[in-house]
UniProtKB/Swiss-Prot annotation:
<comment type="similarity">
    <text>Belongs to the glycosyltransferase 28 family.</text>
</comment>
<dbReference type="GO" id="GO:0016758">
    <property type="term" value="F:hexosyltransferase activity"/>
</dbReference>
<protein>
    <recommendedName>
        <fullName>Uncharacterized glycosyltransferase MK0977</fullName>
        <ecNumber>2.4.-.-</ecNumber>
    </recommendedName>
</protein>
<dbReference type="Pfam" id="PF04101">
    <property type="entry name" value="Glyco_tran_28_C"/>
</dbReference>
<keyword id="KW-0328">Glycosyltransferase</keyword>
<dbReference type="InterPro" id="IPR007235">
    <property type="entry name" value="Glyco_trans_28_C"/>
</dbReference>
<keyword id="KW-0808">Transferase</keyword>
Length: 344
């Protein structure tokens, strides 16, 4: 969505295709833009693992769904005369671009799955093939030695995190606190872990940890969850349009290991407590980066408990997040310039 906003800012009119919650978010953010639906393909289970047998049971018509996705994107490209395709790892969009003969750009921070075994080799082979179908690979991060970049002929460009909005577009902290009814002098702990089964478990355990912590430290929890938890503890919201606002006014953010939220925290220099999903390779790599870059505390899933969360919050609450190169919230702007450059 941040890239879509920046493309509009420079006078381009993006056309979107997506499925599920992603499509709904795009329709809310861009009510006057074309947003097309795609066949839904769930590659990963709720705990973040990739299970080929589960995938085939869930989608016995997987080849047909993939073909339908290619055809849907091909029709959209032709209908609107799209000159470039930008995909966040949607393989069928790249195939559609190849068929029609327009440039393709992939945006991904997952370059290679760590580990051994035939399944890991299969996934890495698919990722490599996807990158080779593209003309440019944009990585929404800054380079460090936690990244294992595969040798591919495709141009790779590091652009920094792509945020929904630029940090300088956010309201002042006192205005955000007034908007949400957060006390001016409160020490804010934001809890947001997505809607998966394990994400909901993180939220519930975090709430119990906050109750333990409240016996020694005065904190104001802000909990983003569709489930009612906490028994009136702090502020609970089912959904927010602009999570960046709440990250800006928070002293600590408890979240899973998702790249987007961790990047938002890094750009706003808000310390995190990261709890990766048990079998999610990308999130475990992201948690490793949290430690290496000094962004906060990582709690391994096997250590997840109210006591461990309370300790992690106490450890992170006065954390000084360093300023990191390209972690400035302008990745969408850089990416938009590259996309526009393919049209010259």
């Amino acid at each position: 969505m941040g890239l879509g906003r920046e493309l509009r800012r420079i006078g381009l009119e993006p056309v979107f295709s997506s499925f599920g919650e992603g499509r709904e978010m795009l329709m809310r953010e861009f009510p006057d833009a074309p947003v097309y639906g795609l066949p839904k393909i769930e590659l990963f289970s709720e705990d973040g693992s990739f299970d080929l047998l589960l995938l085939l049971r869930r989608h016995p018509d997987l080849p047909l769904r993939f073909y339908a996705g290619v055809e849907a994107d091909r029709r959209v490209i032709r209908r609107h005369g799209c000159k470039v395709v930008v995909s966040d790892c949607q393989f069928h969009a790249l195939v559609a671009a190849q068929i029609i003969g327009v440039p393709a750009i992939v945006i991904s921070n997952m370059l290679r799955v760590p580990g051994e075994g035939s399944l890991v080799r299969l996934i890495n082979g698919m990722l490599r093939r996807m990158f080779e179908l593209a003309d440019i690979v944009l990585i929404p991060d800054t380079y460090d030695d936690t990244y294992d970049v595969p040798e591919i002929d495709t141009e790779v460009v590091w652009v920094g995190p792509i945020l929904k909005r630029r940090p300088d577009e956010l309201p002042p902290r006192d205005a955000v606190r007034r908007k949400y009814g957060i006390p001016d002098d409160a020490t804010v702990v934001l809890v947001t872990a997505g809607g998966s089964k394990y994400g909901r478990r993180i939220v519930r355990i975090a709430v119990e940890g906050l109750k333990l912590l409240s016996k020694s430290i005065d904190v104001f929890p802000v909990i983003i969850s569709e489930e009612r938890v906490g028994d009136g503890l702090g502020l609970q919201l089912r959904y927010v349009d602009n999570l960046l606002e709440l990250i800006k006014v928070s002293n600590v953010v408890i979240t899973h290991g998702g790249h987007t939220t961790l990047s938002e925290c890094a750009c706003l220099r808000t310390p995190v407590v990261s709890v990766p999903l048990p079998n999610h390779p990308e999130q475990h790599m992201n948690a490793e980066r949290v430690l290496q870059r000094g962004l906060g505390v990582a709690v391994p899933p096997e250590e997840l408990s109210p006591k461990r969360i309370a300790e992690a919050i106490e450890q992170a609450i006065d954390w000084k997040v360093p300023k990191i190169r390209m972690m400035d919230g302008r990745g969408a702007e850089r990416a938009a310039r590259i996309v526009a450059g393919t049209l010259d």
